[in-house]
């Protein structure tokens, strides 16, 4: 085992003790909160840098042990499908464009999810945008996004879909090396 992987396992063991008595939802919220001030980096999902969907996928991995790495749109369409989530469900807020638009180098189509923010408290989300992620009030974010022609939807996680995708080892598009190390450390900790 290399030194970096050992450090990762030791860190995860310490975190495991902290979250030991928490539910999966509480762990998800905890790990989202711990990700405040991560550097924003497109295509990343690790403990030093992440993009919006990467932060949600990493929180899911740390909270549930289930590994997926997908876009915000795929999270919305495949995994966060509960339209009326219970307060104890793992939840995320999705920002859906009302028309075709270009953001950076990517063109998003009408009704495609352009952004996701994991809910880590009542009306509190981890908003992972440049230059770094921060905890924000969803109520404070809504007027800006609505004025810029986005629809905001909060959905709950379909835990069975997440488990099946993880068990089948699907939906891991382009997971970065650090995400894989975390996944391997979690799998190693399980035995």
What is each of the regions a protein language model found here?
Residues 2-12, 24-26, 64-153, 157-162, ...:
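...with weaker cross-activation on analogous glycine-rich loops/strands in unrelated enzymes
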Residues 13-78:
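Secreted/periplasmic proteins that engage bacterial cell-wall peptidoglycan
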């Amino acid at each position: 085992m290399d030194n970096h992987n050992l450090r990762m396992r030791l860190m995860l063991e310490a975190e495991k003790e902290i979250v030991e008595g928490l539910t999966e939802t509480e762990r998800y919220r905890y790990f989202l909160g711990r990700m405040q001030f991560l550097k924003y980096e497109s295509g990343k999902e690790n403990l030093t840098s992440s993009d919006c969907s990467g932060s949600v996928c990493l929180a899911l991995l740390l909270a549930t042990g289930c590994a997926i790495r997908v876009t915000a749109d795929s999270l919305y369409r495949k995994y966060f499908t509960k339209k009326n989530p219970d307060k104890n469900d793992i939840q995320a807020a999705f920002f859906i464009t009302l028309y075709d638009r270009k953001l950076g180098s990517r063109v998003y189509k009408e009704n495609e999810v352009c952004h996701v923010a994991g809910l880590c408290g009542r009306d509190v989300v981890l908003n992972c945008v440049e230059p770094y992620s921060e905890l924000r009030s969803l109520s404070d974010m809504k007027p800006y996004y609505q004025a810029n022609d986005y629809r905001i939807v909060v959905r709950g996680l379909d835990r069975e879909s997440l488990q099946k995708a993880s068990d089948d080892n699907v939906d891991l598009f382009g997971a970065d090396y650090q995400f894989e190390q975390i996944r391997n450390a979690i799998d190693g900790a399980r035995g």
